[in-house]
Every structure is written in structure tokens, then in C-alpha cells.
Curated annotation (Swiss-Prot):
It holds the Pfam family Ribosomal_S13. This is Small ribosomal subunit protein uS13. The keyword NADP does not apply. PANTHER family: 30S RIBOSOMAL PROTEIN S13/40S RIBOSOMAL PROTEIN S18 (PTHR10871), SMALL RIBOSOMAL SUBUNIT PROTEIN US13M (PTHR10871:SF1). Part of the 30S ribosomal subunit. Forms a loose heterodimer with protein S19. Forms two bridges to the 50S subunit in the 70S ribosome. Keywords: Ribonucleoprotein, Ribosomal protein, RNA-binding, rRNA-binding, tRNA-binding. One of its GO terms (molecular function) is rRNA binding. GO terms for biological process: translation.
Length: 118
């Protein structure tokens, strides 16, 4: 198994699909990385040479991925909450942010129903 950005990449999958195992890399970015490194998208990871894997590592290192990206997202949410803006308040109350109705739906965001105590 190749290790890129601290993640074990599945070596039995095609390069584009295998790169999506890294948080922050989707199909589009994986295709761009393969194009930049001149690696065929349908080449399996186990068929790649060590030099090709090193070029993949260097190309992935140009992007914000994994822990850094998770930290950046959580800091953005924390910043919204500290500002006290509408989106920050919705985050703080665990409610939907983007105008969805909450009278009947939003169970995923709100969590399980809380019974009414008598």
C-alpha cells in the first residue's frame, strides 16, 4: 500500500479512485493531479513505480488536505460562532444553516426526538 499525505492508498484501485481516499481530494482534483503527474487515470496504484508515487506525493502536497483541511474547516465554523452571526448561531444550536424548514424536517441536524416531559 502506498502512503500519501499520511493515508494508506488502496493499491488495487485505479489512481483517480484511490486518490479520493484522501480527505479534500475528490474526483475532479484527482483527475487534475493525474494529469499534472502524467499518470494514466486507469493505472492501478500497485502498477506505479516508486518514482511515480513520489511525484503523486509532491503534487498532493500542493493542496490543503487531511488534518490541515479539517482544522481549517473547524476554525471557520468556530469563527462564525464567535462572531455571533446568523450562521454561527445556527451552528451553535445544531440547526440547519441554509434556510431549510425545521418544523417537521431537519432530524439529521437536530438529532433524535426529545420526548415532552410531563
Amino acid at each position: 500500500m502506498a502512503r500519501i499525505a499520511g493515508i494508506n492508498i488502496p493499491d488495487h484501485k485505479h489512481a483517480v479512485i484511490a486518490l479520493t481516499a484522501i480527505y479534500g481530494i475528490g474526483r475532479t482534483r484527482a483527475k487534475a493531479i493525474c494529469a499534472a503527474t502524467a499518470i494514466a487515470e486507469d493505472a492501478k496504484i500497485k502498477e506505479l513505480s516508486e518514482a511515480q508515487i513520489d511525484t503523486l506525493r509532491e503534487e498532493v502536497a500542493k493542496y490543503t488536505v487531511e488534518g490541515d483541511l479539517r482544522r481549517e474547516v473547524s476554525m471557520n465554523i468556530k469563527r462564525l460562532m464567535d462572531l455571533g452571526c446568523y450562521r454561527g448561531l445556527r451552528h451553535r444550536r445544531s440547526l440547519p444553516l441554509r434556510g431549510q424548514r425545521t418544523k417537521t424536517n431537519a432530524r439529521t441536524r437536530k438529532g433524535p426526538r426529545k420526548p415532552i416531559k410531563k
